[in-house]
Amino acid sequence: MYAQAYFDYDSKKSGGVTMSHLRFGKSPIKSTYLIHKANFVACHNPSYVRKYNMVQELVDGGTFLLNCPWDMEGLEKHLPGQVKAFIANHGIKFYIIDGVKIGIETGMGPTRINTILQSAFFKLADIIPEDQAIDLMKAAAKATYGRKGDDVVQKNWAAIEAGAKQVVEVQVPESWKNAADEGLEMTHAENGRKDAVDFVNTIQSKVSAQEGNSLPVSAFKDYVDGSTPSGTSAYEKRGIAVNVPVWNSENCIQCNRCSYVCPHAAIRPVALTAEEAEKAPEGMKVMPMTGMADYKFAMVVSAYDCTGCGSCANVCPGKKGAKALAMENMEASAGEQKYFDYAVELPAKADVVAKYKENTVKGSQFKQPLLEFS
């Protein structure tokens, strides 16, 4: 048996896009190009179905596995029309699995879903008997994690078994054949420095959608020296998190530790004047700022920049045993993005930084982060 693997990935610190191209067969593999006619495609993040062309890379009758929390009603709502139409018109065998839910139930956690999806792959690909594949995966898990104790091994075994058992085949509706093409979700910048806005709209949006090869040479005429403007990651708004933090002001002690530990500056404290608080978007929660009666305090979250790591909620001391941050479903929390967008445009409050000192955790977090959305 011969095999060839190529892994295409971006430079993001967390939650980046990785595309794994795998070929195998009984003859030597001499292909020097990426796979564009696959027998099997799996999407491990449900937000990607609107951002990238994936099912279009399948041969007729191929298999598509989507990791998502949706039932049939959810699929109708979230799958873009071009995906529905391709699945229906090309006889694609469509399966779904809720890897995040399985990860939580088996103790692996919401982000460690690779083992679960790998088990589902072996069930659907029918390369080797399912029972044999599960046994081999279990043996590999024991060899890899045996030193960490039997508890870790058992969690991996449970995830492997659940991954194979909880795959659900989707009965594709006839109506999907006529679904309208909705296009890919691409970033469009309007506000900000002209050089950054032009770069995002001309190049970055296409490249981020894995459509960079379609750009003409003329698109790069302003960047012939290889330079690119800084600060453009703020426009990406990837929306890759499954769960994001939601702030409960009643339990907040305004320590700013959550902002301090966030690697992506996706959760920020903000000081608002009475006028700024009055003009804030409807529903934005504010509270009196401790030690500065002229200001209101708010903790704002950029759901579309958050990676869902949960570090902020973990470090939050809360009040009387109740945390001020809870990780909740991204879809339900996305409406709070407007609070973040409003807050980050407010002028800096130098007197607030002076009051709490820039060399303290609390004071430093009122300053502009210099590393964001990475």
Labelled PLM ranges:
Residues 133-134, 146-305, 313-374:
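Ferredoxin-type iron-sulfur electron-transfer modules and their immediate structural context
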Residues 1, 108-120, 254, 259-260, ...:
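Conserved phosphate/anionic-ligand binding catalytic regions in large, soluble enzymes, centered on
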Residues 1-207, 277-283, 352:
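Active-site cofactor/cluster-binding pocket
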